[in-house]
Amino acid sequence: GRRCPRIYMECKRDADCLADCVCLQHGICG
């Protein structure tokens, strides 16, 4: 899989990231 952006706002805009991982409130995707 691809790496998710680590910044919360970037992750929020990234549909693939949102499908693949949970964006935690402190900004780390995991």
Curated annotation (Swiss-Prot):
The superkingdom of the source organism is Eukaryota
User: At which residues is there a site annotated Reactive bond?
Assistant: R6, I7
Report disulfide bridges, numbered on this chain.
Answer: C4-C21, C11-C23, C17-C29
Q: Which PROSITE patterns match?
A: SQUASH_INHIBITOR
One Gene Ontology cellular component annotation held by this UniProt entry: extracellular region
One GO MF term: serine-type endopeptidase inhibitor activity
Q: Where in the cell is it found?
A: Secreted
Please quote what the entry notes about the protein's domains. Answer: The presence of a 'disulfide through disulfide knot' structurally defines this protein as a knottin.
Family, similarity comment: Belongs to the protease inhibitor I7 (squash-type serine protease inhibitor) family.
The protein's name in its UniProt record: Trypsin inhibitor 1
**Taxonomic classification:** Eukaryota, Viridiplantae, Streptophyta, Embryophyta, Tracheophyta
